[in-house]
Amino acid sequence: MPRLGSRTIERLAIQRMDHIGIVVEDLVAATDFFVQLGLEPQGTGMVEGGWVDRIVGLEGVRAENTMLQTPDGDARVELTKFHAPPAQGGNGHAPVNTLGLRHVTFAVDDLDAVVAGLRARGAELVGKVEQYEDIYRLCYVWGPEGIIVELAERIG
């Protein structure tokens, strides 16, 4: 069993990360943003019925999903628009230190080109482009509806 500091941790048996789910209000705008980044649409569909209600713990779910895949096929992003019950909360541009899942990171070959392309489409950086040691150039970008996307260019 692996150790973390003084703790021994018993591991379960996951195989890999399959996808990350992001709830959005404007499914088209969010899809367009991620497609512009380079993700490939895999399909859009409506989910509803008792089976989905039981999985998510809500009643009367009617939701539209778009699945997007990274070019290497190793990861996917599922964007979901809840038609019923309506989505709750959401703090548009919550700061990066807000508790909970706060960003998703994508590797890029040319950070400057990707940032320039996103800026041309109206996206804004959360902070600045910075270098981490001799390993990465990194930045955070505001996506639609306050989604934070980290871009990472490996340099070393």
Located regions from the model:
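Eukaryotic phosphotyrosine signaling hubs
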Residues: 19, 101-103
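Vicinal oxygen chelate
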Residues: 2-13, 44-46, 64-67, 75-77, ...
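Non-DNA-binding regulatory cores of transcription-related proteins
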Residues: 90, 94-98
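Terminus-proximal functional modules
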Residues: 12-17, 21-23
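Active-site/binding-pocket entry motifs
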Residues: 74, 83-86
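Core segments of cupin and vicinal oxygen chelate
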Residues: 23-74, 113, 120, 139
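Histidine- and/or cysteine-centered catalytic micro-motif in compact active-site loops
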Residues: 46-47, 82-84
